[in-house]
A protein has these predicted regions:
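Bacterial Sec-dependent N-terminal signal peptides
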Residues: 1-30, 483
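Mature catalytic domains of secreted/periplasmic carbohydrate-active enzymes
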Residues: 27-483
Length: 483
């Protein structure tokens, strides 16, 4: 009888645990917060425009405006000495606003050649570019009819945005337009809405913003998307209903338009992700000058990483202080991003005359030389779901059976370990540059293999190994040792 009682107690305990587990799961479901202005679709967009975006791999960012005239310096002082970025120099206490706001009268980039810019990007292997139409200072690089603070009133006068769009499109590069919501030049801009007067002024500002964005989409119908910035202040976070309606309006007048997660705020002022942790945008834009370490960190969302070449600063600075990234560093970041289902976007900051720095030109040329040989491991590639190894990164060609090893660190032994995902085995391995010479593979007893490089093989830059795979009915992990 005692044994039966114990069994009954155990059975009762299990029933209780199941009941409470079910109750908790039901409660968790009920805890979803009702939102009027949260995410409107869950999961990835699968239309042709977004599929194209997903396959880009490599992009270019260009920060250019009147801040390039100062180049991060004023009266012999470097804004970078106090941690400032060149494109933010108007906010520095050393620079009088009256001085900064008159810089446009000197903006005359005689050396600006958009066709040369686009040709450099094409050689680099860039598939899309994001160009700053208006940064936080409010200066417009197109002749906007809603403000006098634009390129139309500079000595240069010509529409820079149009020239960039036309030149890059002519090279087959898709164009996205950066637009700062924050606008220091507009008297109706507010950081917060503390009074009725603030709200009235900001309502005017919201209309101004909508008008300018409408103007951009009407003027440049070939663009593929908008890249927003300056949306972190309370004034915008309290405007979730407006940002939601703006997002829907822009997509209605420009079908297929791609907008990331920086534009909107939800009912509670959350940005990027709503109160239910769902992405509010077509892709995640939280990866600024940082890259996720694991695929799990991306939450399965589309995403890209935007990266500067110097350690801080997007606009032109006369002096790059400290470390700036080498080509191999940038290539490794590119490979890491693509291996985790993301795109990688490298920023360039031309000077006031419209030319790039020698360091930027060198990086672009060297990246392009590498991409010319190895781009098949970057374009239209995705997360391979193979166990990460120390030699570098895996990418997988979308819809194919090929997996690419982008190798940055060759072990002293010259042998590279791989471990395919379950139910998959490697049929053949070879260097991308020498497909007719298979590499020797040595299978191990726990589902892994070594790929042996030829003794004579030497590499002074990252290289790619192609793995042709096939499905197998056997579990490739092999028998586990008894311990």
């Amino acid at each position: 009888m005692k044994k039966i009682r114990i069994l009954n107690k155990t059975f009762f305990t299990v029933l209780c645990l199941l009941f409470f587990s079910f109750s908790y799961s039901q409660q968790a479901k009920k805890e979803e917060i009702p939102l009027l202005h949260g995410a409107h679709h869950i999961g990835k967009r699968m239309d042709a425009d977004m599929v194209r975006w997903r396959g880009y791999g490599l992009g270019q960012f260009i920060h250019w405006g009147v801040y390039s005239i100062l180049g991060g310096d004023y009266n012999g002082k470097h804004y970078s000495d106090v941690g400032g970025a060149a494109e933010w120099i108007r906010s520095w206490k050393e620079v009088p606003h009256s001085v900064y706001d008159s810089l446009y009268k000197k903006f005359d980039p005689k050396a600006f050649n958009p066709k040369q810019w686009a040709a450099m990007a094409k050689q680099m292997g860039v598939k899309y570019v994001t160009f700053t139409t208006k940064h936080h200072d409010g200066f417009c690089m197109w002749p906007s009819k809603y403000t006098n603070y634009s390129v139309a009133n500079t000595p240069y006068k010509k529409d820079i945005v149009k020239q960039v769009v036309d030149a890059y499109n002519a090279e087959g590069i898709d164009v996205y337009l950066y637009f700062s919501i924050m606008d220091w030049h507009n008297p109706d801009w507010r950081y917060d809405l503390k009074t009725k007067e603030d709200t009235i002024a900001f309502d005017r500002f919201k209309l101004f913003t909508k008008n300018q964005l409408t103007e951009l989409l009407k003027n440049y119908p070939a663009i593929k998307g908008l890249w927003f910035d300056g949306t972190w202040d309370n004034s915008w976070k309290k405007s979730g209903a407006f940002s939601d309606s703006l997002d829907q309006y822009l997509k209605a007048i420009h079908p297929g338009l791609i907008i990331g997660s920086r534009l909107r705020a939800d009912d509670f002022g959350n940005r990027h992700f709503d109160a239910n942790h769902e992405l509010m945008g077509d892709y995640e834009q939280g990866w600024e000058r940082k890259i996720p370490k694991t695929f799990a960190e991306t939450n399965g969302n589309d995403w890209d990483c935007v990266m500067t070449i110097p350690e801080n600063g997007w606009g032109y600075a006369k002096k790059w202080l400290g470390h700036w990234k080498t080509t191999n560093e940038l290539l490794e970041m590119l490979a890491q991003c693509v291996s985790l289902d993301g795109n990688f976007v490298i920023n360039f900051g031309p000077g006031a005359d419209g030319t790039f720095r020698p360091e930027e030109i060198k990086n672009a040329k060297e990246i392009g030389d590498w991409m010319k040989v190895n781009n098949t491991a970057i374009y239209n590639c995705e997360y391979a779901a193979w166990e990460k190894q120390d030699w570098g990164y895996y990418t997988k060609k979308t819809g194919e059976n090929k997996v690419y090893m982008i190798v940055f660190n060759v072990p002293v032994s010259g042998s590279l370990k791989i471990k395919p995902s379950k139910k998959l085995e490697v049929d053949k391995a070879y260097l991308l540059t020498d497909p007719n010479k298979p590499l020797t593979m040595e299978k191990l007893d726990y589902g892994a293999s070594f790929i042996h490089l030829p003794n004579a093989f030497k590499a002074n830059k990252p290289f790619v190994i192609v793995l042709e795979t096939k499905e197998t009915n056997q579990n490739n992990e092999g028998p586990k040792a008894k311990t």
